[in-house]
Amino acid sequence: MDAEKNLDFKVDIRDIDLSALPINDDTVDLDGYANAHGTLTGTLSKPFFHGDVSSKSIMINGEELTDIQCKLDSDGGIKNHLLGSFKQAPKGVLSAELDYNHEQKLLQGNIVAIYGNVRSILKMAKADYNVDGLAQGEIAINPHGSGSGIFVDVWVDDISINDLKYEEMKFKGHLQDKVWYFDDVKLMETKDVTDKGIVAVGGKVDLANGKLELEAGAVDANPALVTAFMSDPVEVTGDLNMFVQLHGTLKDPEGNGSVEVKNGSVAGIGFDDFTAMLSLANDNLKIEQAMLNKDIYKASAYGDVPLDLFRSKEQRRDPNAQMNVQLNLDNARLGILQVISPMVEWGVGETQGQVKLAGTLEEPLVYGAVKIPDGSLKFKHVQTVIENIHTDIEFEGNKVALKDISAKLGKGSFKGSGTYALRSNEREAYQLDLVADNAEIASDIFTGRINGNLTVTPQRFIVRPEAGSAPPPGKGPRFSYRPLLK
């Protein structure tokens, strides 16, 4: 340093403690050690650093970046120019060219990512979501000067959202004045296929005022998207076509939509077609009209499902929230039992009555009554068809009570009553108490004629693999249940 206080130093600083820097605050937790090598010029009151900054590893909000190599020109005020690259597990490479004006609090520049770890990047931004994928693209920060915003144009490969997988996602959007604009956002189940397996989102979210205006559509997509953010999602399959509009606030959104699922299933129970018209207001999802079809059978529904039921129990605003959905079975016919129970192979005959769905999605309850004036039913593992069925069915929450059953079984008949549990272990799933009169039955475990009193309950048995087939996965024998007569 000369008499004019001009600086001309060579700088070689090792193991700079990044956690001690004044940039640490509530949004950024910086940790690790860096080395600086270069020159310090300028004056004592306005020093200027030119050189290299490097580190083997740094942590940003608990997420690691490695092999940091940067060139830095900085006066600590108006001019701060950074050109650098760094790596991110498992195989990400990111580069950045940034300018920061400390006096104007203005950050400008570009960040380019190749195979960037999406989950890790989100955590760096203190957004901890169950989202995975590898991102490639560019982020431009204030490219047209102060306030022009952040522009994102990236593709994400092998993306999963709450374990729901897509091959590719396109995200093109920008943030301006604390408003996120979704310019072109698409999720694609199959790469380069643009006419099916697509979910698209457009609109904006005002982060400052907590408002949103969004539209979302799906074409032959995986319907598991609908349940992806449930705390305990049920298994849903089929082809989803959907259009949804949302507006209002982030806390209490409003909107409407239409949903169709073709050739689908819920928890392994199949249907041909499901359609619904929905509306959302006051933290409640209203089913304006819904129709479920299976072969020639139909069931319709309407009612209310509080959004609390899609949240974990700890996050529910109303811990006592329950759904209230009316289900009309007058046109369902007996074949609809295939949708309700996997034990039923097929059924024919009229059904008369209505039931109400209550409870939660995890523990649904059913109330109401259905009458079967004359029908036929075929159970799995039982070869004999039950004909001329007459019964009154009462739904009592988790229990289905079969009152005054009478039916023809072979050349004989039976009458009696029974119960069926909607949720229970298989050992206690059902019990039928019957009086048989020359009833003929052929099943996997019994074939013959029955007279007298009998009880039908589930029996556990070992599932033995067929000759030449591979053994079942896992250790030990695999068990299943079938009807036991006693």
What are these regions (language model features)?
Residues 1-87, 94-188, 195-401, 405-412, ...:
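Membrane-proximal interfacial segments on either side of biological membranes
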